[in-house]
Amino acid sequence: MPSNKVRTRFAPSPTGYMHVGNLRTALYTYLMAKHEDGTFILRIEDTDQGRYVEGAVDVIYNTLRETGLLWDEGPDIGGPVGPYVQSERMGMFKQYAEQLVAEGKAYYCFCTEERLEALHAEQRANGEMTHYDGCCRDLPEEEVKQRLAAGEPYVIRQKIPKEGVTGFDDVVYGHIEVENSEMDDQILIKTDGMPTYNFANVVDDHLMGITHVIRGSEYLSSTPKYNLLYQAFGWEIPTYIHCPPVMKDAQNKLSMRNGDASYQDLVAKGYLSEAVMNYICLLGWSPKGEYAEQEIFSLEELIKIWSPDGISKSPAIFDPLKLRAINAEYIRRLSPEEFQKKAEPWIDQAVHTPIDKKLLCANLQPRCEVLGEIPEQLDFFDAMPDYDVSLYANKKQKTTPETAREALEALLPLLSDESLDFSDRDTVFNACKAKAEELGKKNGWLLYPLGIALSGKQRTPGGGTDLACMMGRETTLARVNAAIEKLNG
């Protein structure tokens, strides 16, 4: 692989929906590659069959496509260093482990589960951290050959140096060193011949020419072992970028197991994909310089200004109110046509009678923060809810149930006039305004009761004339007449 070109990879496990933290890793990995005009690789790490969820690979594909994180190499489109599904690469890992054995950097371990359990129990009883005691580390070569020939089960362990320190540099956390004596002789190949996650990761990253590894800070403690593997093979160590955890609050990590929202959950609630990605990017990262005060970024803008130097060491708190605010801003920036297209599925959940959707959307868009909250605002269109006439009392509009009846009776002939065009909201509003002037009243005195009569609610997506135009003449007259009857009690 060309050594001067940035190559990054997103390597998810197909275990279900896309966690917010995973999606942030995918985004940062994508931005790192694209900012440097490099290559973004998708690799599926499916070796843990116990956690594999049917259909989860499609969730990964669909989520990345939906969010615009399109990969340059991957399982479906191929590339020069495939296959890009880890389970399809199984044959190569054992030979790399055996190479380390031949060079004296790894060894066959024949310890049984029972021995290891007894060892760890003893260590715990003595107040020690559990660790492997190196029982098979220096077995005579002849004994190893005999035990292998006899078909005795084994794992392959890496020989971690017993003395000295192993250090590494991280873009976010700086230089970190760990005493070698604190590290276990990690398993590289399990008894079933499958590689461990750490080993497969290092081998695959090297063979795929990965230059920058971006992952969660929970992997910081494993990184010295990764480095020892790179050194054992004589391979170039990639640039490490570890990201802080995404927290629900000061004490708890965001976790789908605890019912916290996945990307799919947020979209299902009516958050826009672009808004979610914008917010996720700001979870633990902030732009510098002239962009420091900016909060709304397109993916193209993020590619342009991306720098891993903006990643914080501090845990990022997932703030639902901040996400709402960003989502509301994205909704406001949509064209009326785009908003209607996105809002219609939500409108159709609640409204099954003919209405003027264009006018409804014009009223919804400035007020809407999350699309999923649209249906609950529209329940009065299909059926008039039962309401108390006390709703007609409004100090600001100087209305009472008595004045409301007077206002509705004054509006009835106007709204009944066949020449009044209900498809033109401004025409209807101006006619009502003229009627208010004729009566010597303010607009609200006349139109506030109309809104109550048509909806049975104080808060609606639009005032009285807007609701009348959305519903049309027939429904409007039926509801106004019913309201007058109710007020006559």
Regions found by a protein language model. Give the residues of each.
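Small-residue-rich helix-loop
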Residues: 336-439
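Conserved phosphate-binding loops in nucleotide/dinucleotide-binding enzymes
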Residues: 83-87, 110, 189-190, 208-219, ...
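N-terminal Rossmann-like or analogous alpha/beta NTP/dinucleotide-binding catalytic cores
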Residues: 2-125, 222-235, 275
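Charged substrate- and nucleic-acid-binding regions of tRNA-handling and nucleotidyl-transfer enzymes
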Residues: 426-488
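Residue-level signal for inorganic ion chemistry
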Residues: 29, 60, 100, 104, ...
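Structural motif
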Residues: 20, 266-274, 313-319, 352-360, ...
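Active-site cores that bind ATP or allylic diphosphates and position pyrophosphate for catalysis
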Residues: 102, 107-242, 248-254, 262
